[in-house]
Every structure is written in C-alpha cells, then in structure tokens.
C-alpha cells in the first residue's frame, strides 16, 4: 500500500490468491514510500510490482511512483489496484508516466492471476503489454471526447444557482451540549445490531445485497459460508473484547459566510475558532437543479439565525492489527483478513449508531425517529453526515480542522497520516448537518476559478491545493500564471472522468497524445 495510505484488505486478498497459484509475494505492508518499494524490487529481483490504495491522494502517489520507475530506468510491469483506482485513471494518469514497462489496472483479485501469468510469459508478455497500451490509448481518447460535451459554469454563476433555502421560517434545534463528548470502550454488542453487511461481501468480491446474496444462485453457497464464519468470529470479538471501540462527537455554534462555514467558540458568536471550507458543484445543471455546496445547509451569518454544526470521529480498530497479525503469524491469512473486514464493519456501524443518537438524543432534532436498520442503510433519516475526502467535500485536508476541533488523537487515539488517511484504518470521521433539506451530493469536476478562490480562502498556495484536489480538477495544472476566471463560452479543458470521481489530472508538461491533442486544439490546429 502506497505512502500515506493504511488500507490493505484488498491487497492482502490479492496476495493470497497469487500465493495459492504458486507465485512468491513480498508484502511490504502499508504506508510504504516509493523509494522503499523500488529498492526492495531491485534487491529481491522482483518480476512485477503491485501498488494499492484506498484514499484519493494515493492516486497521485501512484503516478509519482510510475514516474520514478521511468526515471530510474526500471522496466518492471506495474499493477495498479484499490478502491480509488480505475482503468481511466491508469490510462490517463499513470501509463503516460511509465513508458519503459507495461502498466495494468487490476480491478479484482480473481483477475490478478491471469494478468500476472500473461506478464510472466516470455511468449505472451510483449503482445499482452501492447494490447493493454493500445486499449488505454483508446480509453484516453474516449475520455477526451466525452469532456468536450460537458459544460461547466463559472464559480460566480454556480454560486448564483446555490440551493435555495427559506431561512425566514427555520429555527435550528440547539444541541444538548457544546464542545466535545468522548465515548471510551463503547459496547460492541450495540454496534452489531446496525452492521451493514453488503459492503462486507463486496470486500470478498461477492456481488449482491444482503440478505438476498445468501440465496443467490451463483454465489449464495459461498456467501452463506462466509457469513457463518463472520458471525462466529464476531461473537468472539464481542465476548472476548478482541479490540475496543472509542469515539468523540462535538457540536459548535456555526454560520455560513459564502462557501465557508465559520465555527464559533460560544453562543456569543464573536470569536471564530475554525472555518470549514466547502466546494461547489460547477457542472451546468438542467432547469431546476442546483449547484450545491455544503455551506448551503448552514444558516448564513447575515440572517442572524443561531445555527450549529457537529463533528465526529470513531474507531473500532484499537487492537485490530495485533489480532490480525496473530492470525497471520499462525499462517491463517483467511482469519487475518476476516477480522480486519469485521473491524471495518464495526467502525461503520459505530458511525451509524452515533449519528442515530445525535439525531434523537445529543442534538435532538429528530427525537421521535423510529427507523429500522434497513432504513438507516438507505439514509432515510433527517440531516446528513458528510466526510472530508468524499464526494460532497473531496478535500481530505479538511480533516485537519475536524480533528483539531475534536482533539481526536488525544481523545480516542486516531491519527491522520501525511495523506490524511486515518490510523487505525477501521476509523470513520465526518460532520453533522441537521437541516431537513440537506442532502448528499457529489461536487464533481471543478474549474480553475474555484480552485484559485478555494486556495485563497484556505490561505494555501494554489499549486498545493491543486495537488490535493487533483482527482476533481477539470483542467490541467500548469506552471503558467493562473487565470482569474473562465467564460461560459470556453471549451472545457481535457479533464478527469466526470463519471469516475477518482480520476487525477495529468502532471505538468505531460507529453502524451491526450495532451498534444488538447494543446493543438487550443492553438487552433486541426485534429
């Protein structure tokens, strides 16, 4: 797993599948710098290198790693996998950085064996690599064509189409306390009741919704066996307290100022203690559709309404790694992965349970809520809990503000890595919004004018924020002087896949055909 990323369940499954097919696998673990991966590949005389990552900053790290392979003259096949990755990202971002060897996106463990076999075959390797590269060239071209049809608004126009809320009749509920509240060693048995099992099966690449998957004609038998093992282990986890769950929640007076949410120290609302910066959708919408930002759901300061914002961080991973390593050292890789997958499910269940208690008890804006587990999974509740680094706020750096307000590291032992992943990995954090009209959405691709504005509001250099926001940029960052705005008549720059929100932009000065075509178009050239 690349530098700054802590997630390894999928990687571990791939490793086991390859080992079962008589391949030797050297697993370097998590948060591994590029230099260490390259050094180990040289020392061990590796035939193939595989990279994995879950959070979006890992995409840039993979692109950097590919460029390092090229710079250092290595010619090893490079496999790319993980939840944030895609064929489009691999074709447009990684493959152009590494021309000396084949780059292959592997979307699941079952495909890994066939890919490795082709790359290890003296007869097949060259033809297979050529096929993949030709396929990626087509993907890049299709991606470019698709972007030409997508129209985006200037930031000013997008703000003019913000979510309209009638604040004149709104009276926010007041939380039962301000500041933070810590929950140490939360009862695991309470979390079991609200586990969402569908993602658990997805970890094992079993497609289907729970509980219907248990009776599926294709994967039902395997799913039932896996579920039985999981329930037995879960019973032991709870009974023997293999690891503990801890959480911290908090509420603060807050009001929106433009696209920002200003957080105050107390009800006097005279001393700001933090600011959450939000991003706004810029894709041109159909009539009646709005360009949302999370700040739209907090009462503006000039309304005089006393609104609030909440935050949380929870973990079920305290002790998880020790248990997983115990199984691994006993050569029980299956149980090692199973315990990690269950810790993830418990962490998500903890987030669900705390949000439920916030709505009914701690903030109390929905005291009479009576939703069952299925309704909770479908998010039929009032209010939202968006998380930094996810579609409604794709900037992972906003976690730093949340963690500072919660004092999360001291309170519950959860830390942020250099890429703003949470450690332990089985942790969840986010914000609480109470407005009944708030909803989840994806920001999608954004233009340079918004990135300039966002960087200025955060007080950070433009190039730094372009790096953190790379997966959602609808332009190619360059060393040229930034423009102040875009016009609605400009053709959009070649961008990152609007369907795939995890696509990163190209590096400055990239010489791939994708860029050449764009530069020719800008210069008025044909073709």
Predicted regions: what is each one?
Residues 1-3, 13, 29-32, 50-58, ...:
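Active-site proximal loops enriched in glycine and acidic residues that flank catalytic Cys/His/Asp
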Residues 108-336, 341, 360-362:
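Active-site loops and adjacent core secondary-structure elements that bind or stabilize anionic groups
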Residues 69-91, 177-213, 446, 451, ...:
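Amphipathic alpha-helical packing elements
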Residues 1-51, 260, 283-291, 298-370, ...:
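ATP-dependent carboxylate/acyl-activation modules
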Residues 247-258, 356-456, 462-463, 467-470:
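Compositionally biased, low-complexity/repeat regions
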Residues 11-21, 27-97:
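Cofactor-cradling patches in redox/metallo enzymes
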Residues 151-161, 166, 461-462, 466, ...:
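Acidic, low-complexity intrinsically disordered tails
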Residues 65, 69-77, 82-145:
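Conserved phosphate-handling catalytic cores of large alpha/beta enzymes
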């Amino acid at each position: 797993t690349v530098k700054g990323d802590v997630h390894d369940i999928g990687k571990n499954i791939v490793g086991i599948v390859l080992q079962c097919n008589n391949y030797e696998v050297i697993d370097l673990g998590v948060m591994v710098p590029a230099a260490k991966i390259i050094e180990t590949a040289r020392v061990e005389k590796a035939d193939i290198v595989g990279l994995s990552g879950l959070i979006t900053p890992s995409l840039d790290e993979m692109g950097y790693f590919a460029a390092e392979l090229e710079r250092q003259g290595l010619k090893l096949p490079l496999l790319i996998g993980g939840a944030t990755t895609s064929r489009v990202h691999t074709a447009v971002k990684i493959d152009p950085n590494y021309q000396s060897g084949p780059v292959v996106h592997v979307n699941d463990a079952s495909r890994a064996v066939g890919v490795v076999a082709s790359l290890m075959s003296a007869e097949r390797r060259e033809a297979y690599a050529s096929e993949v590269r030709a396929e990626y060239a087509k993907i890049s071209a299709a991606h470019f064509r698709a972007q030409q049809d997508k129209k985006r608004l200037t930031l000013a126009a997008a703000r003019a189409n913000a979510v309209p809320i009638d604040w004149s009749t709104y009276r926010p509920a007041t939380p039962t306390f301000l500041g933070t509240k810590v929950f140490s060693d939360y009862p695991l048995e309470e979390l079991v009741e609200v586990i969402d099992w569908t993602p658990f099966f997805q970890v094992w690449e079993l497609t289907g919704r729970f509980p219907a998957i248990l009776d599926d004609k294709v994967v039902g038998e395997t799913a039932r066996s896996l579920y039985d093992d999981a329930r037995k282990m879960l019973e032991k986890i709870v009974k023997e307290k293999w690891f503990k769950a801890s959480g911290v929640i908090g509420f603060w007076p807050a009001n929106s100022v433009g696209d920002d949410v200003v957080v105050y120290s107390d009800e006097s609302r005279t001393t700001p203690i933090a600011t959450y910066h939000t991003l706004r959708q810029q894709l041109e919408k159909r009539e009646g559709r709005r360009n949302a930002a999370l700040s739209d759901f907090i009462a503006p300061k000039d309304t005089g309404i006393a609104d609030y914002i909440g935050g949380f961080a929870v973990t079920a991973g305290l002790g998880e790694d020790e248990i997983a390593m115990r199984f691994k050292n006993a050569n029980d890789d299956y149980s090692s992965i199973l315990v990690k997958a269950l810790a993830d499910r418990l962490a998500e269940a903890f987030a669900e349970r705390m949000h439920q208690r916030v709505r009914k008890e701690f903030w109390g804006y929905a005291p009479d809520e009576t939703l069952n587990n299925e309704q909770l999974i479908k998010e039929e509740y009032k209010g939202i809990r968006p998380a930094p680094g996810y579609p409604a706020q794709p900037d992972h750096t906003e976690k730093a503000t949340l963690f500072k307000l919660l004092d999360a590291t001291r309170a519950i032992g959860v830390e942020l890595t250099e890429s703003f992943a949470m450690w332990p990995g089985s942790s969840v954090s986010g914000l609480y919004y109470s407005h009944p009209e708030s909803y989840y959405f994806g920001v999608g691709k954004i233009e340079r004018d918004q990135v300039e504005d966002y960087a200025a509001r955060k007080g950070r250099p433009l190039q730094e924020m372009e790096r953190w926001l790379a997966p959602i940029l609808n332009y190619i960052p360059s060393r040229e002087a930034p423009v102040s705005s875009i016009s609605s008549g400009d053709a959009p720059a070649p961008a990152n896949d609007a369907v795939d929100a995890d696509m990163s932009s190209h590096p400055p000065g990239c010489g791939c055909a994708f860029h050449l075509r764009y530069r020719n178009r800008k210069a008025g050239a044909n073709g």
